[in-house]
From Swiss-Prot:
This is Error-prone DNA polymerase. It comes from the Bacteria. Its main location: cytoplasm. The lineage of its organism: Bacteria, Bacillati, Actinomycetota, Actinomycetes, Mycobacteriales. GO terms for cellular component: cytoplasm. Its EC number is 2.7.7.7.
Length: 1091
């Protein structure tokens, strides 16, 4: 067994878990195998490159990484690696207007023993860096002299970004910068945009002298150095000599830098292309503006000494200044702020008070639930020992706010392993009853704060985020960034733009790149230089986004730790670091995640109460109701949370869920880990009695009994260590972590010996048995899914399935209200509701709300006005408010006189049939739209269109369907394929509803609109297509060979004819495609493509 060479491949996992012998010549682990993708950035791994070293001491004090966003062509890690290879004694990271790459820079430097200097190049101009090829305004290069200098710099960066009022336009106050420095910064005169060099270029030596005098007056001579750079420009030598001549006059030092924008010369062409993208020009059109970058790479001390042989003291001074400014980033680690507790309480005592009150509600008095109270005492002791009570109080406060404001929320993930979280009402899963291990969530050996994810109704999450801002203050709370990186399509498009190709070519070539692989499916016609540059820029940062839910709360102004800037969304401020950066530096993060299904469930509850008079309490639903499980076993799960995907619908008939824990297993089975770990088929075979339930050793039975001897959950690995080898729960968590994605050779060696010793002592097991068990544990460690997470989600599976079964109209309307969410488009959701007997009506200005609702005692659905093209939610709300306040609209002129609507908006309402309440056909309403919209009371008489409506024929069924789809995206009472059914029948095309009667292995011809294309990372190149006709849905499997033969058609066609072989031996129906053809629909359809 190897301990440090990564997780096993898919095939190897199946072999291990099934106890099969290894094939000759196959290694235990295949580093290039099909491994799971982690959402977390792994620990930095140095590349092991040979170091050339240097006999001349030198520190690079001016370097831009890719986190200067299109002004640097290497990652911070690549800069550090090259600095280590060259033997530099220190390296400064000085990205534009931020510390975006500081954590990555620090992590790499710590591994490679490179001293770090933190700084930034401030853009003092008033315009954004991306608005023109060469934005006006000077730059100021600031180096922090130690942690205090870092804090002051971070604060000033944040102040400038927030003062700018919008993303990407920092506004600095030069006097405020002067005051903030306080001797804790060192100022370099900068490159060509620096105050002094720019003054020299524009006004000659006298102007340069004045600019330098200003810097010295502001920051003192001991804190200013003249910067000499050489990028190969013809005037570099002359300008450097002039600048060096100013130094004695002002008593300032001289330092040499490379002004690096990339690590090594090979990235020079990419740097120029990125500069052109930043300028929104092609390389040719921006050539006159782009600064020469040929020499803007890191250099060794020897090379710098040769380049500045005429001024060797500049190279020496750079090394000395680097040593003086260098420090480690861990020195700025923050903490959580103290929580405001009632008088007479500490955080620990107040947490205990809240937990015990909640426990009495959840479990009753202590005598009735001794196990639960014992577990709570244990958890409170650990929380106090780790000094985390404040964290739990903050989370409780957030969930309390949600409950007080009627916002559905629930904690998930490993937090559901905690009885304290359950008692506080943070989670909905009882960990005591479900025998979950608390140490999976929190243990004394943990090296960071706990991680609690809170799912919140998507449509209400903004209220919760603003509550956190309000409670803690914008200075102490911010959202976590999400770094948007280049992927295949965006890389091809931007590189083609930089090279001057037309927008049409850019778009066409980018579409040749696969959604799934990021590689070009067909490189024919794409110029080699575009592919080369696109390959280089892939995975480099393009811009900063906002994390889906991460918020940081800090015990000091958060800008002391990391700069904050405005996000694109209103009233959102965002850190310059992502979630992994925050975790690495010790910032405490809370994940407030929007979950569309919680919004849908809330809407469904409200609709049922409003239209049927039934109050639904989700917590009191009968989780054993057979009818719900029977519906799911038929794979009747369109719209149902977590089990509506193609893979889940294929598994449900095989699993045949009968009890709640079956849903827990179903949620966990179709995940990358269990799929790659080979757990799916063994579990289903055992569940259906095909294979026997066997255990490698009797001690494994308690941990694996619930999953029939097949490991699915991470908690099972820990329980196996407890049961087999006598580990404590905390030791078991250490084993899980040591075996996980961040494998530790030393810890693995120690814990392996502990496991063997424990199993020998407890059970007298021979080494060959222990070998097999340990091998399975190690193989499984990377693939297990958290049982606590599956339990949390399984509740939502049941709740949503219950609504679909008992209140299908309310369920459909709720899903439409909560869009965008889920796996299916509104058209598919409406078609499914219709197949379940629900009548769906189009929008109507006198009957619709702004969003979808129910009618006829909750048995029918009415589409909302907000779904009509050009209207939007805000205008739809105004229209409904006017109708509510002043009565129904009596005519089209009455409507347009009371609500201001444009001609396109009235035409869209007419096309959608929303004006039918006025006794007008759609064509008549369209004819009258222009006159009505332009004939408002604020218009002069006679200037509008004619209001006379001639006799017009009505629309055909096909035209009505096309009008519906154009206006709302949904055809409420038809499906595009029904208009082709006669032709399809003549061709021998089988409707979806009849596939259940086809024998396994028979060949059929099917047709339908493509609703999804999906190629999971776990599927080894297989692509799944979902077709839908007016009778139902069909899952289609495309092997890599079939996909390759029909790639362009399969990838782009909105509807397909497919001939293939039926597979239904297991109860789940799939058609394995053999040939494909285009199907032309008279009414449009769109697909959703997933990884």
């Amino acid at each position: 067994m190897g301990w440090s060479n990564g997780p096993p491949s898919w095939a190897e996992m199946e072999r291990v878990l099934n106890g099969k012998p290894r094939h000759a010549g196959v290694p235990a682990f295949d580093a290039d195998g099909d491994v799971p993708r982690s959402r977390k950035r792994g620990a930095y791994q140095p590349p092991g490159r040979e170091r050339v070293g240097s006999s001349v001491a030198y520190a690079e004090l001016h370097a831009h990484s890719a986190y200067s966003f299109l002004d640097g062509a290497s990652t911070p890690e690549e800069l550090v690696e090259e600095a280590a290879r060259l033997g530099l004694c220190a390296l400064a990271l000085t990205d534009h207007d931020g510390l975006y790459g500081a954590v990555r820079f620090a992590e790499a430097a710590a591994e490679l023993d490179v001293r770090t200097v933190f700084g930034a190049e401030l853009s003092l101009g008033a315009t954004a860096r991306t608005e023109r090829p060469d934005p006006p305004g000077p730059h100021l290069l600031v180096l922090a002299r130690g942690p205090e200098g870092y804090r002051r710099l971070s604060r000033q960066l944040a102040a400038a970004h927030l003062a700018g009022g919008e993303k990407g336009k920092p506004r600095y106050d030069f006097d405020a910068l002067t005051e903030a420095a306080g001797g804790h910064w060192h100022i370099l005169t900068g490159c060509r945009k620096g105050h002094v060099r720019q003054a020299l270029s524009q006004g000659g030596p006298a102007a340069a002298q004045r600019a330098l005098a200003d810097l010295v007056d502001r920051f003192t001579p001991s804190r200013v150095s003249i910067e000499l750079t050489h990028h190969g420009h013809p005037l570099d030598d002359e300008r450097n000599a002039a600048l060096a001549g100013l130094a004695p006059r002002f008593g300032v030092g001289i330092v040499a830098t490379t002004g690096a924008h990339f690590a090594d010369p090979s990235r020079g062409r990419l740097a120029m292309a990125m500069a052109a993208i930043r300028a929104r020009r092609s390389l040719d059109s921006a050539a006159g503006w782009l600064a020469p970058l040929g020499g803007a790479h890191l250099r060794s001390g020897e090379e710098m000494a040769r380049l500045f042989a005429w001024c060797p003291e500049a190279v020496t001074a750079a090394a000395e200044l680097g040593e003086r400014c260098a420090f480690g980033l861990q020195l700025i680690a923050p903490r959580l702020p103290p929580f405001d507790v009632p008088d007479g309480h500490t955080e620990d005592s107040w947490l205990r008070s809240l937990v015990m009150a909640g426990a009495r509600e959840r479990y009753g008095p202590p005598k009735s639930a001794p196990r639960a109270y014992s577990q709570i005492e244990h958890e409170l002791k650990v929380i106090a020992q780790l000094r985390f009570p404040g964290y739990f109080l903050v989370v409780h406060d957030i969930t309390r706010f949600c409950r007080d404001n009627d916002i559905l929320c629930q904690g998930r993930g490993s937090a559901a392993n905690s009885a304290v979280c359950y008692a506080l009402g943070v989670t909905a899963v009882d960990p005591v009853a479900n025998e979950l291990l608390f140490e999976r969530f929190l243990s004394p050996a943990r090296d960071g704060p706990p991680d609690i994810d809170i799912d919140i109704e998507s449509d209400q999450r903004e209220k919760v985020i603003q509550y956190v801002y309000h409670k803690y203050g914008r200075d102490y709370a911010a959202q976590v960034a999400n770094v948007i990186t280049y992927r295949g399509r965006s890389a091809v498009r931007d590189m083609a733009r930089a090279l001057g190709f037309s927008p049409g070519q850019q778009d066409a070539w980018s579409k040749q790149v696969s959604h799934w692989t990021g590689q070009a499916d067909d490189v024919d016609g794409i110029p080699e230089q575009v592919i080369d540059l696109a390959t280089q820029i892939r995975n480099l940062p393009r811009h900063l986004g906002i994390h889906s839910g991460g918020m940081v709360i800090c015990d000091r102004p958060i800008a002391d730790v990391c700069p904050v800037e405005w996000a694109r969304m209103a009233n959102r401020s965002v850190l310059q670091w992502d979630k992994d950066d925050c975790a690495a530096i010790g910032l405490v993060k809370f994940d407030l995640l929007g979950l569309g299904m919680l919004s849908a469930l809330h809407y469904a509850k409200d609709l049922v109460a409003e239209h049927k008079g039934i109050e639904v309490d989700l917590a009191r639903l009968d989780l054993s109701e057979p009818a719900v499980y029977e519906m799911l076993a038929r794979a009747d799960s369109v719209g149902v949370f977590q089990v509506e995907s193609r893979a889940q619908m294929a598994t449900l008939p095989r699993l045949k869920p009968r009890v709640f824990y079956d849903l827990v297993v179903e949620v966990a089975l179709i995940r990358p880990g269990p799929i790659q770990g080979g757990s799916v088929h063994p579990y289903i075979r055992r569940r259906n009695g095909v294979d026997p339930v066997i255990y490698e050793h009797p001690s494994m039975a308690p941990a694996l009994r619930k999953t029939l001897g097949v490991p699915l959950f991470q908690e099972q690995l820990m329980q196996l260590a407890v049961d087999c080898a006598g580990f404590s729960a905390a030791e078991a968590d250490q084993l899980r972590r040591a075996m996980g994605s961040k494998r530790s050779t030393e810890r693995m060696r120690r814990l392996r010996g502990r496991f063997y010793d424990g199993m020998r002592a407890l059970h007298g097991a021979p080494d060959e048995v222990i070998d097999r068990i340990y091998e399975k544990l190690e193989a499984f460690a990377n693939f297990g899914f958290p049982e606590s997470h599956a339990l949390s989600f399984a509740s939502l599976v049941f709740y949503s399935a219950w609504f679909k079964l008992h209140h299908p109209a309310a369920f459909c309307a709720a899903l439409l209200r909560a869009q965008p969410m889920g796996f299916y488009s509104p058209q598919s959701l409406v078609a499914d509701a219709r197949r379940h007997g629900v009548a769906v009506h189009g929008p109507c200005v006198n009957a619709s709300l702004a969003h979808a609702t129910c009618e006829n005692a909750g048995t029918e659905v009415r589409l909302g006005l907000g779904a009509v093209r050009y209207l939007g939610a805000e205008l739809a709300e105004k229209l409904v408010a006017e109708r509510t306040a002043n009565g129904p609209f009596t005519s089209l002129p009455d409507l347009t006189s009371r609500v201001q609507l444009s001609v396109p908006q009235v035409e869209a309402l007419a096309t959608a049939g929303a004006l039918g309440c006025f006794g007008m056909s759609r064509r008549e309403a369209l004819w009258a739209a222009g006159a009505a919209a332009t004939g408002r009371p604020d218009r002069l008489p006679g200037v509008g269109s004619s209001s006379h409506i001639p006799a017009l024929p009505g629309m055909s069924e096909l035209e009505l369907a096309a009008a519906d789809v154009w206006a709302t995206g949904v055809s409420p009472d038809s499906y595009p394929t029904q208009f082709l059914r006669a032709d399809l029948d003549a061709m021998g095309v089988l409707p979806a509803e009849r596939l259940g009667s086809v024998s396994d292995g028979d060949r059929v011809l099917i047709a339908g609109a493509v609703t999804h294309r999906q190629r999971p990372a776990t599927a080894q190149g297989v692509t799944f297509i979902n077709l839908e006709d007016e009778t139902g849905m069909v899952n289609v499997l495309c092997t890599p060979g079939v996909w390759a033969r029909h790639r362009k058609l399969a990838h782009t066609a909105p509807a397909l004819l497919i001939r293939g072989q039926v597979q239904n031996a297991s109860g789940a129906i799939t058609v394995v495609a053999e040939r494909m053809g285009r199907l032309t629909l008279a009414v449009g359809a769109r697909s959703r493509d997933f990884r």
